[in-house]
């Protein structure tokens, strides 16, 4: 699912079909896609290269191409339709590396099909309640996050209502446990300036008897982690 490649386009198409099948409206009127483009350097293959007079200049100059990409965005309108909460995960990964000797495919089951499946399940759960959320919920699947989180950056920079977004919940690599001896262990990041995010999880664990042992990690800086960076540019509370 390398960004801009065939696998990534198929993944975007699949996610859009999942939203449609679940009955989740697209954020835009026409469809769930938010297309954008970016430049990237051509990947060079390993091997022997003939040395020409201008070889150094050519190598320094590099070869670029334009890639077409797309975020996938769905929404459930809330009782306060002009206030928003975003639930997101990136769906791209590293694709295929032909220079590798054995398995050349980066499958990306944990990074980040696990987060994508969580966002889809949350969207379905919202619909299953039959109730309107308090705020409008946007379900966002970001393209090209692995190399500069361009998908979420593009959304933030082009969103006309970004000042009305009240928070962002990010799901990334939730399919594995860094402490095998503690199967209920989970890492939970949140913005330090908004400790209520930590309090809410503690309350839910007690209320619903969730089998989780969170490792609470408060971020002192609003820029936070890799995939929350674009949202943090607008100083959104994040978890």
Feature-to-residue mapping (PLM):
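Solvent-exposed, acidic/flexible segments
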Residues: 4-12, 29, 65-67, 84, ...
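Solvent-exposed loop/turn segments at secondary-structure junctions
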Residues: 19, 25-26, 42-43, 65, ...
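Alpha-helical metal-binding/catalytic segments enriched in His/Glu/Asp
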Residues: 72-74, 87-148
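Structural recognition of the beta-strand scaffold that forms the well-ordered cores
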Residues: 28, 34-35, 71-75, 84-88, ...
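Extracytoplasmic/secreted proteins, especially bacterial periplasmic and envelope-associated proteins
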Residues: 6-21, 31, 114-121, 125, ...
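Metal-dependent peptidase/peptidase-like ectodomains
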Residues: 142-239
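Second-shell loop/turn segments in exported
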Residues: 1-6, 21, 58-63, 100-112, ...
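A non-catalytic alpha/beta surface segment that caps or lines the substrate-entry region
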Residues: 1-75
